[in-house]
């Protein structure tokens, strides 16, 4: 009888704004950090931290670390600044997801976890009556 290997799963949290992209890998419970890479670690210019290219390079670095740890399957949680800020993820989110898939990691589910205000503070630069 062939033995079945237990698949190791991880969670990849992608925080993407227009200024930076932070990719953070944890175990399946979310309690233990495996690796954390940001756009600022892979580029020299501050203006390029939020670019799709920097996000792609960061994702490839993270995928390398995950494979060393034996994690082949991941769930992805995408987050934008949210709250009273931008509700849409920055340009690096899609590039990072594509790079993780290209690196050979199997993606289970992709989830949007952007915080949504339930009538919280007034957004800045909003018209007041």
From Swiss-Prot:
Q: Which GO terms describe its molecular function?
A: rRNA binding; structural constituent of ribosome
Pfam families to which the protein is assigned, alphabetical:
Ribosomal_S11 (PF00411)
One Gene Ontology cellular component annotation held by this UniProt entry: cytosolic small ribosomal subunit
Provide this UniProt record's keywords sorted from A to Z.
Ribonucleoprotein, Ribosomal protein, RNA-binding, rRNA-binding
UniProt record, GO biological process: translation
Q: Its function?
A: Located on the platform of the 30S subunit.
Looking up NCBIfam families in the UniProt record yields:
arch_S11P, PRK09607.1
Identify its protein family.
Belongs to the universal ribosomal protein uS11 family.
Q: What is this protein called?
A: Small ribosomal subunit protein uS11
**Source organism per UniProt:** Methanocaldococcus jannaschii (strain ATCC 43067 / DSM 2661 / JAL-1 / JCM 10045 / NBRC 100440) (Methanococcus jannaschii)
Upper lineage: Archaea, Methanobacteriati, Methanobacteriota, Methanomada group, Methanococci
